[in-house]
C-alpha cells in the first residue's frame, strides 16, 4: 500500500488533517482554514427540534450561518461523488440546499432532488437570491423517500446522520433508490472510538447533553459505526476520509455546536473529574478567566463513500 503526504499552508489559525483510504493511504494537512465551524440542518423526530426547523425565522437564521470549514467539507463531499455531469442526485435532509450548491456547479445536464421534512428550510432555500441551478426540492421523510427504486446515480446526506432516529432504515432506503453502481456519500461529525469504560461513559454524557436541545434521537457516531451501518445495509465502501479541524481561541463562537460542548465540559468538571480529563485528552481543553473561556482542541468529520453493488 502506498503512502503519500501533502502539506498545504494558508492563513489564520485552524488546520485540518485528512486521512483518506482508497486502495492505499493518503495523509494531507491543510493549514489556515480558520476556526469558523457550522453544522448543517438534519432531522430529529422530537417535537422541539422539528418545531425549530419548521419555523421560518429559525430556518432563515440557520441559512445565514456558514464557515470556511463547512464550505471546505462540502467541496470534499462533491469530490467524493465523482461526478461526470449528467447524474441524477438525491440530497437527503437537504435543509436550505447549502451543500447542494457546490455539487450543482459540477453538473451539466444532471439535476439534484433535495428532500427534507422541514418545509420552512425548503422555503428559505427556494427563496435564495442566487438560485441553485438544476436543483429541485420536495418534502419527505428520510427513511421513506417518494421515489421509485433504482432512480438515482448518486446520493448524499450531510450533517444529518446523527439526528436520524432510524439511521439503518435511512441508508437502506437510499440503497433502494440508487441505481446499481451508484454512490452514496455520508458527511457527518464523528466522535472518538471508545477504548475503555471511561470513553463509553463520556460518550453517554455527550449524547445526554446534546439531546436536551436536539431530542432523544440524537446520537453521535464513530467512524467505525458509520462504516458498519453502510456495510450491513449492503454497500461496498471504497473510500473513507477522516478530517479533523482544530481551534485555539477565546469562546466557542464559530465552533460547531460549541455551546453544547462547553456544557459537557462544565458538567463533567463538576460531576466527574475522570471524564473531564478524558474530554480534554480526546477533544479540547478549556480554561476560564473572568467571564471568558479559552478553548483549544479539535473536532472530526467523516466522509464515507458507499457504492451499491452492480
Locations of regions flagged by a protein language model:
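A short glycine-rich, Lys/Arg-flanked "PGG" loop and its adjoining helix->strand segment in the class I
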Residues: 168-183
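Short alpha-helix
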Residues: 218-233
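C-terminal helical/coil "lid" or tail adjacent to the Rossmann-like core of SAM-dependent
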Residues: 241-295
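A conserved beta-strand element that flanks and buttresses the S-adenosyl-L-methionine
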Residues: 156
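Class I SAM-dependent methyltransferase SAM/SAH-binding core
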Residues: 90-92, 96-144
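Core SAM-dependent methyltransferase catalytic element
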Residues: 257-258, 299-310
